[in-house]
Amino acid sequence: MPVPKRRMSRSNTRSRRAQWKAALPTLVRCNNPACRQPKLPHVVCPNCGTYDRRPVLSS
């Protein structure tokens, strides 16, 4: 198996790790015309409890 020939310096390690960034979650508007709150896609709306305009959770 290949192994590194030299130890990677601290500055090279940190500059390589600087490219790793956390991505913001994608938000969409709820399909319920009465709600329209931002929510995660493909997830039941936590505000009104609907999914694809169908009531799923009873509030």
Curated annotation (Swiss-Prot):
PANTHER family: 50S RIBOSOMAL PROTEIN L32 (PTHR35534), LARGE RIBOSOMAL SUBUNIT PROTEIN BL32 (PTHR35534:SF1). Residues 1-19 have a biased composition (Basic residues). SUPFAM superfamilies: Zn-binding ribosomal proteins. One of its GO terms (biological process) is translation. One of its GO terms (molecular function) is structural constituent of ribosome. Transmembrane segments: none annotated. InterPro entries: Ribosomal_bL32, Ribosomal_bL32_bact, Ribosomal_zn-bd. This is Large ribosomal subunit protein bL32. Residues 1-20 are annotated as: Disordered. The keyword Plastid does not apply. Disulfide bonds: none annotated. GO terms for cellular component: large ribosomal subunit. It comes from the Bacteria. Belongs to the bacterial ribosomal protein bL32 family. Keywords: Ribonucleoprotein, Ribosomal protein. It comes from Acidothermus cellulolyticus (strain ATCC 43068 / DSM 8971 / 11B).
